[in-house]
């Protein structure tokens, strides 16, 4: 469910989960489309795998940082062992009716133990950061775990192997209410609007995702290029040409400059879907380089109170990374070298 909805919002600017239990109330997204896209990922398992360092990353810095964290973990492990020994000793010293608490610690030691456990967890998380990982598709063996008290559904074809021969629509989103079968696919409305070839997706394991990826970046797809351009525009101007970058549906906002959105989408595809080139085009444009001060502020405030005409550059809220880099830059502590500790 999460993968289907994330793909829908990121590349198609549609919240797919709205069509999980019923046809979308505001957009032409039937339930069949939702389960068709979900069928693309029905044979997919995600896992964390170790990845190699990038060429520009500083392995030496990562090694030093990992060593520092390991030394902290060792120190806390030692403190924890000392506390455990103290607990054993105090348990042996119980006399009369005055018993030691359940854990054998006084309030001060309890606070120390809590601090040690919290720091151990924090440093182990920090240690994970220095190990490059990637979220990839798991292709190993699947261990099936079952709840012995749960409801048992006998498979229709017990010896079917490799991949599901069919996926179904769950009526009302209930996994126990199986409805019509559905084939892997994309959004039918996008195919009809863009004149795309509505070829059925292959059923083979691994081929479904490739088919969806090709469908998403098809030049006839009326959504993807516009969605990506609108999203990148919003990074630089604080808002997109079409409002919410994740909502191109009926509840979203109409584009303020539809011709510009179409032009940039066409330019984006003709330039190999290069985000770097699109960033360069936007950042070197007269629109982006305009001052936030207009020579006639009263007139522009009356004619364009929301700044939708881009007669001046409206200040936008900085993200955390930009604030961090700005503070390091003005203090002279920014390291311009690529790679190293994040």
Task: Please give the residue ranges for each predicted region.
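Primarily short, surface-exposed interaction patches in extracytoplasmic proteins
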Residues: 28, 64, 71-342
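Sequence context surrounding c-type heme c attachment/ligation sites in exported
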Residues: 1-77
């Amino acid at each position: 469910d999460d993968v289907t909805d994330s793909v829908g919002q990121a590349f198609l600017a549609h919240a797919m989960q709205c069509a999980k239990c019923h046809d979308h109330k505001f957009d032409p997204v039937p339930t069949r489309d939702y389960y068709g896209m979900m069928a693309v990922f029905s044979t997919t398992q995600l896992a964390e795998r170790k990845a190699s360092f990038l060429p520009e990353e500083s392995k030496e810095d990562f090694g030093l940082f990992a060593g520092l964290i390991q030394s902290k973990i060792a120190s806390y492990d030692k403190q924890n062992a000392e506390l455990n020994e103290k607990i054993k000793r105090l348990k042996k010293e119980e006399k009369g009716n005055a018993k030691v608490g359940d854990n054998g610690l006084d309030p001060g030691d309890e606070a120390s133990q809590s601090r040690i456990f919290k720091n151990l967890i924090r440093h182990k998380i920090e240690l994970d950061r220095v190990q490059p990982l990637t979220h990839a598709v798991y292709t190993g063996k699947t261990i099936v775990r079952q709840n012995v008290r749960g409801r048992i559904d006998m498979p229709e074809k017990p010896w079917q192997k490799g991949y599901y021969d069919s996926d179904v629509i769950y009526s009302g989103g209930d996994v126990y209410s199986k409805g019509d079968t559905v084939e892997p696919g994309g959004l039918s409305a996008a195919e009809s609007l863009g004149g795309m070839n509505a070829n059925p997706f292959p059923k083979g394991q691994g081929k479904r995702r490739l088919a969806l990826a090709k469908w998403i970046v098809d030049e006839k797809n009326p959504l993807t290029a516009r969605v990506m351009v609108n999203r990148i525009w919003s990074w630089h101007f604080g808002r997109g040409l079409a409002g919410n970058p994740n909502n191109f549906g009926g509840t979203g906002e109409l584009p303020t400059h539809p011709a510009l959105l179409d032009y940039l989408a066409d330019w984006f595809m003709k330039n190999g879907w290069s985000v770097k080139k699109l960033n360069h085009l936007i950042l070197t444009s007269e629109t982006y380089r305009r001052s936030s001060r207009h020579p006639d502020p009263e007139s522009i405030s009356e004619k364009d109170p929301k700044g939708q005409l881009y007669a001046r550059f409206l200040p936008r809220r900085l993200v955390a990374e930009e604030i961090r880099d700005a503070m390091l830059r003005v203090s002279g502590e920014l390291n311009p070298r690529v790679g190293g500790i994040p």
